[in-house]
């Protein structure tokens, strides 16, 4: 006797096969190509219906995990017989789990049984009475969605893609704002160059352009909403004595359009920064408490997702963002970097140069713990208590290394010097002519300078002459020496030749 266990979206179905060796015969499997043949081959022996959609999801997850649920075990116990029967199962893990139950079944699960399941699934509505095709497809679709949600553990508040896109857009906005602000200052600087030195903030600079227009309107313009009183006075004072050129109304219109873009971009950047902060507190509250919103968001964006970052060890988190320097150091066999993106965290910034690496290592270890709690904790907790505790431990370690209490350094506000208006200097015509009193003195100085230059030239000329004479003497000595050597060589050669001739003559005479 052979049974086929079929898991459907409506419940468990146990089908009895007319041929007990169907799983062994390939020809029988190929014959299951019509509904009549399938209905003749399989009859329903038992059916265990799922009570609800939640129950269906639970049972489906049990089958996927290879576990035998109590409902399935009850169904198999009801159908077991005295004789050992064959049970065809689709999942290998589930087959092993059923074997461990000790029921009187020979459980089979291999590649051949897949063809049986393909035929059974195709004609399932005909095999199960009381279930039509439309109802079964609706139940299957609902169960598939439930399984997908369960696997993904989907939550709208936990979507880290929003953080990745937000931090990337924030960086792009910063670049655009800097470019636009620089262009605006250069453009308007032709008309009012002193304004850029007085007002350093780009957004305030753009708002002044929109409010004031040309510098002539500075005295009548109210800038109290944009600037403090002292700086406003300095701007108005500088506008009265500005050295800038005049611009046409068309120029001003275009400059104002650029200033409007800067103000709008700055407002949107602030809105995006607030959005990123709220998203980070929702997705990774403990990491946010430990390293801050921007550093945390950059870590998540660099690794790709919160889960992949949570799976990374502390050593990887420590040097995340410094991969280029790491591989260069490994290639050249130099010291590896001590920190990457964590360098921008406030705790690392508070440490002195020699302790930055140690604090980065401690911070990375605590960040790894916080990340795993944020990403993998079953009970959601947005308080960030673990992050606060970890931060306190890192601060205590930093105090121990630095030997001082951690205190937030107050921001130093520079006092702006007031611009004082001085009377414009009149043109002095006497400055263009040489006064009679100063003329003799100037002429004496000039004559002295001329004498000094003459003496310097004479001394240089004498030195050159001496050097040339010395060189000539040396050359003459060398030439005399070389001539003498040549003469001696010639005489020696002549003597040698004469001697050889004499020897030859004497030899001939002897013969």
UniProtKB/Swiss-Prot annotation:
Keyword Ribonucleoprotein: yes
Compositional bias ranges of the Basic and acidic residues kind: 398-408
GO molecular function: snoRNA binding
Coiled coil: 442-511
Localization per record: Nucleus, Nucleolus
SMART domains the record matches: NOSIC
Region (Disordered): 398-511
Protein name, entry field: Nucleolar protein 58
């Amino acid at each position: 006797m052979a049974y086929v266990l079929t898991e459907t979206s409506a419940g468990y179905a146990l089908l009895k096969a007319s041929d007990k060796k169907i799983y062994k015969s390939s020809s029988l499997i190929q014959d299951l190509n019509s509904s009549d043949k399938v209905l003749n081959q399989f009859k329903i022996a038992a059916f265990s219906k799922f009570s609800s959609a939640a129950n269906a999801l639970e049972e489906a997850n049990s089958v996927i995990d290879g576990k035998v649920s109590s409902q399935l075990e009850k169904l198999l116990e009801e159908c077991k017989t005295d004789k050992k029967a064959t049970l065809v199962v689709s999942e290998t893990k589930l087959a092993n789990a059923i074997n461990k139950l000790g029921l009187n079944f020979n459980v089979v699960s291999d590649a051949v049984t897949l063809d049986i399941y393909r035929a059974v699934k195709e004609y399932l509505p005909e095999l199960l009475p009381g279930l039509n095709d439309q109802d079964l497809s609706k139940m299957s679709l609902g169960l598939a969605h439930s399984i997908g949600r369960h696997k993904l553990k989907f939550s709208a508040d936990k979507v880290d893609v929003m953080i990745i896109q937000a931090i990337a857009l924030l960086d792009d906005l910063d670049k655009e704002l800097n470019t636009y602000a620089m262009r605006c200052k250069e453009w308007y600087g032709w008309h009012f160059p002193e304004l850029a030195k007085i007002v350093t903030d780009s957004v305030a600079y753009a708002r002044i352009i929109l409010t004031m227009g040309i510098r002539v309107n500075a005295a009548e313009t109210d800038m109290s909403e944009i600037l403090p009183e002292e700086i406003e006075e300095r701007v108005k004072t500088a506008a009265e004595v500005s050295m800038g050129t005049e611009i046409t109304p068309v120029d001003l219109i275009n400059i104002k359009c650029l200033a409007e873009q800067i103000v709008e971009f700055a407002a949107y950047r602030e809105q995006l920064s607030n959005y990123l902060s709220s998203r980070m507190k929702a997705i990774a509250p403990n990491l946010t408490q430990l390293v801050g919103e921007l550093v945390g968001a950059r870590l998540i964006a660099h690794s790709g997702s919160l889960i992949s970052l949570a799976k990374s060890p502390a050593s990887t988190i420590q040097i995340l963002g410094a991969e280029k320097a790491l591989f260069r150091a490994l290639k050249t066999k130099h010291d590896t970097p001590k920190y990457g993106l964590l360098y921008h965290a406030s705790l690392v910034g508070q440490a002195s140069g020699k302790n930055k690496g140690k604090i980065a290592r401690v911070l990375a270890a605590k960040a790894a713990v916080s990340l795993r709690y944020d990403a993998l904790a079953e009970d959601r907790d947005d308080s960030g208590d673990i992050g606060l505790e970890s931060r306190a431990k890192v601060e205590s370690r930093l105090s121990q290394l630095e030997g001082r209490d951690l205190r937030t350094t107050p921001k130093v506000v520079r006092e702006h010097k007031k611009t004082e208006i001085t009377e414009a200097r009149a043109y002095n015509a006497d400055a263009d002519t040489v006064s009679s009193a100063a003329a003799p003195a100037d002429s004496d100085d000039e004559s002295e300078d001329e004498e000094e230059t003459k003496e310097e030239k004479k001394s240089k000329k004498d030195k050159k002459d001496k050097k040339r004479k010395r060189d000539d003497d040396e050359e003459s000595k060398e030439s005399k020496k070389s001539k003498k050597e040549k003469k001696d060589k010639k005489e020696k050669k002549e003597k040698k030749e004469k001697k050889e001739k004499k020897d030859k003559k004497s030899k001939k005479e002897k013969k």
